[in-house]
Amino acid sequence: MTTPQIIAHRGASYLAPENTLVAFRKAMEIGADGVEMDVQKTYDNELVIHHDYMVDMHTDISGQIYDLTMGELKALDFGSWKDAIYANERIATLQEALELCAGMEGTQVQLELKSPWRTTPTLCPGCWMRSAPPGSPIGSPSSPSTTPSCGRQSS
């Protein structure tokens, strides 16, 4: 019998601000096999981890991810909405999130591609290949056809 995999949706989002590095760390600390994260593209074509198109619910400003630059997003507090102990938690880049997961042996990653763009095959593998160790599993529940192109093969 196969043991089910536990994938923490947006990290340990009950315990920490969703889709943040602290949420991904906590998910692994409590025993998850992997994390699911939402990827969006910023105004200046950077890839960040955030579920909603708008930042309104998680910051003190109103705006859409794709209308804001990486610098503008990195200046925002994405943690205080959850609890004061998470004040100044910043939005994570895809690169930062993948590097964190690569440092936690055996961590599986599922990417949910949220932005209204369709360049997944060229953006996803490049970032993943730079930060993931050989054989690291990755998938995209919303775009299963991209999964083979995103997984890094052992050499």
Q: What name fits each language-model region?
A:
Residues 1-155:
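Phosphate-group recognition and catalysis centered on beta-loop-alpha active-site segments
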